[in-house]
Amino acid sequence: MSKLLFSFLLLIIGVSAQFQFFEQMFNNGGQQHHHHQQPQDVPSDSQWYQDNYDRAHCSGYLCPGTLSCVAVPHHCPCAHPVYEEKFELADGNAICISKGGFKAGEAARKVELARKGLI
C-alpha cells in the first residue's frame, strides 16, 4: 500500500512540474518572468502639489487644500468630508474641523463657543 502511495505521489509531483514548465513557457511567451514593482510614494517635498496646482485651470477661486475650483473661497470643500465638518465663519472664510465622533453640527457649536471664549 505504501509503495503504491509513494508511486502515486511521485507521479503527481512529476505532472505538476511539467505543467509549471509549459505554463511558464507559453503564458509568458517564452519571456522571463517580470516582477511587479510597488507603486512609488509621492516625494516628501511640495513639488508634486505645486505641479498639480500650476496645471489646474480655474476661472474662479482655486482652493489651496483640495484644488477645487469654486466661485468664492468659503465654498471650498473639506479635503476629507467623511471626517471633517465645514464651518463658515462670519468674516467670509470657512474652516474644516474634525468631526471627532460628535453628532452633526456639534463641532460647529464648539467652534462658536470657543470663539466666544466660553470653552
From Swiss-Prot:
This protein's record includes keyword rRNA-binding: no
Origin superkingdom: Eukaryota
Keywords: Signal
Signal peptide: 1-17
Tagged with keyword Transmembrane: no
Family: Belongs to the LCL2 family.
Main function: Probable component of the endoplasmic reticulum-associated degradation (ERAD) pathway.
Protein name: Long chronological lifespan protein 2
Protein species of origin: Sclerotinia sclerotiorum (strain ATCC 18683 / 1980 / Ss-1) (White mold)
The encoding gene: lcl2
